[in-house]
Amino acid sequence: MEFPLDPLLTPIEARVLGALMEKQLTTPDAYPLTLNSLLLACNQKTSREPVSHYESGEVQRCINELQERKLVEVDWGARAARYDQRLTRVVSLDKAAQALLCVMMLRGPQTLSELLTRTQRMFDFGSTQAIEEKLQHLCVKTHPAFMHIPRLAGQREDRYMHLLSGAPDLEALAAQTHNRSERNDDGRTQLEERVTLLENQLAELQAQVARLLEKSAE
């Protein structure tokens, strides 16, 4: 399959696939995810822009549609079905590209410094220069999955975003920036990352307990 996807991803599809990709890289022992774990991952209060409030039924319907598109695969366990994303295999993305795509799907357009901070638990780029070189390569493909957004009014840096949900409305992005002050990466972002780390550790422990219960039931 080539980019762009046909049809493009809806907001909930992007959130579901992004959450699956994130947990696959950050908490592999808790992956694939059950419906409940996936719902919690989609509706996290941290590392999500915007924060969502999806219901279980909405996520289940989305999963069913993604299964039909071969973008999600179900793993039938002893106690509950678990869901595995297939997007990165369908479109042949390596781990570095998966980490970048994951953050953009969950948090929208990102600066290089934001990507460096927010991908560090998924892939060790080491520097913003390494990320920039990777994105430059990805942005010049015949059917690119990523796009470079020059610095807009009210912004200090260029940004990058994914194109799996379509091309951006640059006027809307500029308006969002005008109505919301820039985040301080050395403060709030680092706090969010620490909270997310604790959430992921809790999810991993819960998954380990669930797997032990599955084994005891066999």
Curated annotation (Swiss-Prot):
InterPro entries, per database record: DUF480 (IPR007432), WH-like_DNA-bd_sf (IPR036388), WH_DNA-bd_sf (IPR036390)
Domain of life: Bacteria
Disulfide bonds: none
Xref: SUPFAM superfamilies: Winged helix' DNA-binding domain
PANTHER family reported for this sequence: UPF0502 PROTEIN YCEH (PTHR38768:SF1)
Family per similarity comment: Belongs to the UPF0502 family.
Protein name: UPF0502 protein CJA_1529
